[in-house]
A protein has these predicted regions:
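Structural beta-sheet core signal
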Residues: 44-46, 92, 166, 191-194, ...
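N-terminal glycine-rich phosphate-binding loop and ensuing alpha1 helix
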Residues: 38-103, 107, 138
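Conserved beta-loop-beta/alpha segment of the NTase-like Rossmann-fold superfamily
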Residues: 100-209
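Short, Lys/Arg-enriched N-terminal segments with co-localized hydrophobic residues
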Residues: 16, 21-41
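Catalytic-core segments of class I nucleotidyltransferases/pyrophosphorylases
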Residues: 162-165, 172-173, 177-185, 197-200, ...
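Intrinsic-disorder-associated, low-complexity terminal segments enriched in Asp/Asn/His/Tyr and depleted
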Residues: 7-9, 13, 31
Length: 317
């Protein structure tokens, strides 16, 4: 029978077991990435720099993507949706109050961890953490920069010869992003846009077959058909359509792609919702509180045990 010689050996034994367990988890994740052809390394670009003026009740203190739904920023919810399908490498294009986003993620690991502060030995020990296995790059792309120019300014961070996801920091959906990626690869065009069917205050598209033949930023009237859902996949060469000055993603580059037959619609009939007003925010909050949030990926995301994080608290830390 094995006999402990001292507490030191006991501690070393548990340290070895912990190391072996972490190595196993790392190897398992690497194996899954290989099975998926390395696709989990794809970049997810999130536009998070606008002023959010229609939601000024919240955005006078924090940027719109940091407005909380169920105690967490909507930005976090969006990232959870991508992460559920194995896409964990994020580039956040900040602007207005970008420091709030940086502070949130700077403190995120601490706030989601069980931790021991040993003041006597001047040590901090993280016992366990509920933080996601994400890589998050935050770039201040300018206060007044337009959407297309924000993407242009982070082009050096994108992987060569690989498509990238792009979305806005204010909308959630129940889309299967791996299905969207497979769809994008199947048609061989420059870009894929999610096409959804809510109210007509968003950009509309004319679709023939699967190809988008016309892109209209904000149509008039109720009969506007499917609209731009704001969840895109682009091939890397798309950045050539962009400039660093006064380039709106929606009114110029997307329309050019449509005219060239390089923009394809991925039609989605599931849940989709954009948070533009306080009423929208309250609706999402209500869905969350009732436990009926369609975008919640509960089988992988441990939402129930996620501690509430107030981004304003991070500014004081």
């Amino acid at each position: 029978m094995f006999k402990w010689c001292s507490n030191t050996y006991k501690l070393e034994y548990f340290a070895i077991i912990k190391f072996i367990f972490k190595t196993f988890l790392w190897a398992q994740k690497l194996h899954l990435q290989c099975l998926n052809g390395g696709e989990s390394a794809m970049k997810v670009v999130i536009l998070a720099g606008g002023f959010g003026t229609r939601l000024s009740e919240e955005t006078h203190l924090i940027p719109k993507p940091m407005v909380e739904i169920g105690g967490r920023p909507i930005l976090w919810h969006i990232m959870k949706c991508y992460s559920h399908y194995g896409f964990d490498d994020f580039i956040i294009c900040g602007g207005y109050k970008c420091d709030v986003i940086k502070n949130f993620f700077n403190h995120y690991f601490l706030y989601t961890s069980d931790v021991t502060f040993d003041f006597k030995r001047k040590k901090t020990e993280f016992i366990s953490s509920k933080a996601e296995d994400w890589r998050v790059t935050i770039v201040d792309t300018g206060l007044d920069t337009m959407t297309g120019s924000r993407v242009k300014k982070i082009q050096h961070l994108l992987n060569d010869n690989e498509p990238f996801f792009l979305t806005y920091g204010d909308g959630v959906c129940d889309l299967n992003f791996r299905d969207q990626l497979n769809f994008h690869k199947s048609h061989g065009k420059m870009a894929t846009v999610l096409a959804v069917t809510p109210p007509g205050r968003f950009g509309s598209m004319t679709i023939e077959g699967e190809k988008v033949t016309k892109f209209i930023e904000k149509p008039q009237g109720d009969n506007c058909g499917r609209i731009n859902g704001g969840f895109f996949i682009f091939n890397k060469p798309f950045v050539r359509y962009l400039t660093e000055d006064d380039c709106s993603l929606e009114s110029g580059p997307l329309d050019r792609l449509a005219c060239q037959g390089q923009l394809v619609a991925h039609e989605h009939d599931g849940f989709w919702f954009a948070m533009d007003t306080l009423r929208d925010k309250n609706k999402l909050d209500d869905l969350w509180k009732r436990g009926s949030a369609p975008w919640k990926m509960s089988d992988r995301a441990n939402y129930q045990h996620s501690a509430k994080i107030n981004p304003l608290r991070a500014l004081k830390g």
